[in-house]
Amino acid sequence: MINKNFLEEPNIVDLAKEIFKEVFQNKLEIYTRFSLLSDDLYEADTINFILADGLGYENLNSTDSYLNKNVTKSINTTFPSSTNVALSSISFMKNPIEHGLIGYYMYDKSQYGLINALNWNEDNKNLLLSDHFQKQNSIWKIFKENKIYASNFQPRNLVGTPLSDCLYELSSTIPYDDEQNLLELLSESTILENRFNFIYYPLIDVMAHIFGVNSEEWQIEITKFEKLVNEITNISNKKTKTIISADHGLVNINTENRHDLNYSDDLQIYGDQRSVYINGSKESVLEAFSQIPGVLLEKQELSCLLGEPTNEFLKSIYPDFCFLVEDKNIIYPKHLSAQLNGYHGGLSQEEIKIPIIELSNY
């Protein structure tokens, strides 16, 4: 059974809105549904928001990391639990069905077909220039218009990519090379005057994908991250609040639970490998997934997780069905073949629950 109240529960969009509302010190009206953060947030001169890719609540809780002592709550990430979906939801302060980036892979029925919506290519990146996306204001554009001193720290290889250009303002984006370089940049006098810093940190996710959650390599990365966030929080003499969350957690998938999917060309298979979007006839879908453990959702059930499309653009990317692969299992459609250890995209507690971690120097 799916959680029909999923969209009513606190999620990463609610967290982002609460942070941004305080960045503006209530000078900009931002509607919030919940109070997720500690009261001392309102004392902060500088607010850091670190998005630790892959640092799921259950994953972190399985370690003896000191960060567990600073976890104040766990909330939901987006559905599906994919990086591009969560990052877009933060920047636009909207749920996926509202901003339009609804999966790792998407399928545009009207023009572009299958799209890798994390790594856009020359053939389909112009979809991001459509009216639907261009009419939306990211928080970074709002910061710029309101003269808020804010910086967005991204790994250098991500700056200038189609997704980055869609979500962020180039003038406030600062590339970094590694942890030491990040600390040096945050120590610069102009940055120390910032009201807000957003830091995207991908390495925990990388280690989990390649080596698996709880692997030695993953544990080493957790330890490095602990040290980094402590230094970031104490880098300034100003009152600094650091809030850490994630886009998803990960699950390790054994080789015997990885299923190659055979299907005819009358089906379009996309989305993620744990939450699989499908276009086509129900008969063909049932045949293709007959040997795959999981449950098939039709549009009405899917709307409890994703919401309903409200315009023609959203209807053109909305799937006919979604197959939720059973926990500890994964499928390989025709366009994906990489053999990893850790995966995400599904609805398990490990994937969907993310922590709110709060640190301060006051």
Give a label for each model feature.
Residues 1-362:
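Feature captures the catalytic ectodomains and active-site-proximal regions of enzymes
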